[in-house]
Amino acid sequence: VQDEIINKPKRMGHHMMAPLYFTALVKSGVLQVQEADDKKVAGILDLSNSMYYAHHHSLTIIQRGEAEALALASEGGTLLIDERTLRFMIETPQDLMSLLQFRMRRDVTMNEEKRKLFQKYCDNISIIRSSEIVAVAYEKGILSKYFEGEKREVLEACLYSLKSRGCSLSTDDIDDYLRMLG
């Protein structure tokens, strides 16, 4: 994960700011870098990237950083995932198959045996999304300490900001949050 968040982006001009920020968080002790078990990571990569097939070819679904995060969280932790593909793979693998079929415009099959084995890695993981953290911050009044404006407007702005930064939130999801909380 450190490689994907800090090391690789440092070499790409338009992504250089985030690695500087995360490096500072690690140095100050706010974030900790942990090493994942290589065997567990390899097992997760093997299963996840041989679970779905299109035209008799396996589909690469996750990368090493995601597998490392899963390996670390598989011991009863919580995993923050904004990326739809991995979240669907963990929570609703059948929906991921449908999404892949839609995106690829071809039939996709799922190896049920590998899905069951993969699911064993995920049984003890609690999944949360950034939008859920924003919702809790809104409910507890934390957002109003940092942002000026009407409460509902601040919530909406935060949710759209997450969406524009890669959180897999649809406009319907945002409307649902606003209806429930605003």
Segments (PLM) and residue ranges:
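Active-site-proximal, substrate-binding regions of enzyme catalytic domains
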Residues: V1-G77, R84-G182
